[in-house]
From Swiss-Prot:
<dbReference type="GO" id="GO:0071880">
    <property type="term" value="P:adenylate cyclase-activating adrenergic receptor signaling pathway"/>
</dbReference>
<feature type="transmembrane region" description="Helical; Name=7">
    <location>
        <begin position="341"/>
        <end position="360"/>
    </location>
</feature>
<dbReference type="GO" id="GO:0060158">
    <property type="term" value="P:phospholipase C-activating dopamine receptor signaling pathway"/>
</dbReference>
<dbReference type="InterPro" id="IPR000929">
    <property type="entry name" value="Dopamine_rcpt"/>
</dbReference>
<feature type="topological domain" description="Extracellular">
    <location>
        <begin position="321"/>
        <end position="340"/>
    </location>
</feature>
<dbReference type="GO" id="GO:0001963">
    <property type="term" value="P:synaptic transmission, dopaminergic"/>
</dbReference>
<dbReference type="GO" id="GO:0046960">
    <property type="term" value="P:sensitization"/>
</dbReference>
<dbReference type="GO" id="GO:0033861">
    <property type="term" value="P:negative regulation of NAD(P)H oxidase activity"/>
</dbReference>
<dbReference type="Pfam" id="PF00001">
    <property type="entry name" value="7tm_1"/>
</dbReference>
<keyword id="KW-0472">Membrane</keyword>
<dbReference type="GO" id="GO:0042060">
    <property type="term" value="P:wound healing"/>
</dbReference>
<feature type="topological domain" description="Extracellular">
    <location>
        <begin position="105"/>
        <end position="114"/>
    </location>
</feature>
<dbReference type="GO" id="GO:0007212">
    <property type="term" value="P:G protein-coupled dopamine receptor signaling pathway"/>
</dbReference>
<dbReference type="InterPro" id="IPR017452">
    <property type="entry name" value="GPCR_Rhodpsn_7TM"/>
</dbReference>
<dbReference type="GO" id="GO:0008306">
    <property type="term" value="P:associative learning"/>
</dbReference>
<dbReference type="GO" id="GO:0007189">
    <property type="term" value="P:adenylate cyclase-activating G protein-coupled receptor signaling pathway"/>
</dbReference>
<dbReference type="GO" id="GO:0005929">
    <property type="term" value="C:cilium"/>
</dbReference>
Amino acid sequence: MLPPGSNGTAYPGQFALYQQLAQGNAVGGSAGAPPLGPSQVVTACLLTLLIIWTLLGNVLVCAAIVRSRHLRANMTNVFIVSLAVSDLFVALLVMPWKAVAEVAGYWPFGAFCDVWVAFDIMCSTASILNLCVISVDRYWAISRPFRYKRKMTQRMALVMVGLAWTLSILISFIPVQLNWHRDQAASWGGLDLPNNLANWTPWEEDFWEPDVNAENCDSSLNRTYAISSSLISFYIPVAIMIVTYTRIYRIAQVQIRRISSLERAAEHAQSCRSSAACAPDTSLRASIKKETKVLKTLSVIMGVFVCCWLPFFILNCMVPFCSGHPEGPPAGFPCVSETTFDVFVWFGWANSSLNPVIYAFNADFQKVFAQLLGCSHFCSRTPVETVNISNELISYNQDIVFHKEIAAAYIHMMPNAVTPGNREVDNDEEEGPFDRMFQIYQTSPDGDPVAESVWELDCEGEISLDKITPFTPNGFH
């Protein structure tokens, strides 16, 4: 989340540049800019594609939710919109300026440096905090679905989003504008200068006023701000995400195994009644596959996030203790190269381009995306049924149909089961994810089971990261 030079090291030609500045030689004055080399052209193309992809993906997510009433009705999508907006700001307010500086080899925007640094910290922190809020929302919806349905109102969702953005602003604009984030190196208009330049006075013969068109937007962080901001922006949120997604997996595992045991018993009873060979291990294998898919799903969520941001935040905390840093010891481990640091900065920002794919590409979003892009007639129309295990963390194709007698068999094997119309959950402590299994069987007004329609699962289904849609009291969305 830092500009070039933030790791306390200098560009290879930076000292030569300062020497020219000290001698009064203007750089980049009337002379034309040198032509871009092959590496600069490749860098420009790659960064442009990344920025465009980030913009399009997050704009598409926002447009889909604004257009679809069904998506707007889901409170979790409030957090998805907030995440998309923060990632959109990364693509608009952060990436383009750094991309130009990367290609040009210097910071051409002068005193805008401080504002850009504040935007960088704010947008990146907001994106990470929104990911943390989404994980907490999903855990709450899965572990306490009925309480979640009562408590998670639009007002509550907006309060949670507001807190995430407020915290992001507090740790970015206030410290940056007050220069609390900087080390003790002298600076001019947000542009760091060597100590010998800082000690010059206007009446000295070789005094030079900095040329803002040829400077480096260097913002070396002091130790206090580097560690505290990293804790708030990354380490605490990632710890919360690890805990919540671990709990989600355990809850999903329990649900899958309990449902699988009911499936095996029902299949065994049905096959024995029809004099067919009993194969109870089929559902067991399906259960293992489902658990594996849930694990893969959660691994993608955490794996992408950690791989994108962890390297940067490790360096962000390590750099103030480097030997080349103004606050670092005279002898210590050297700072990383500028190229390495920049690569990890872009890795972190690349997370904003992947979030729309991870958090929004489920069946409902895909349908609206197809309408927005005008390809609804060409896109796949394979029906997707979301199985409410772990509150729609998994989606399956409609292939295997369990009819009336199997659904009824589940109820006969659950002696304490009651229909949802007669069962109320008043005690949150007694509520558990498996309570929703009672909602499989429902009686219509004329006494016929509604479950005779279908209850569909697909053991070979395709995984997708779906939104959270908690069960309503009547057992349907």
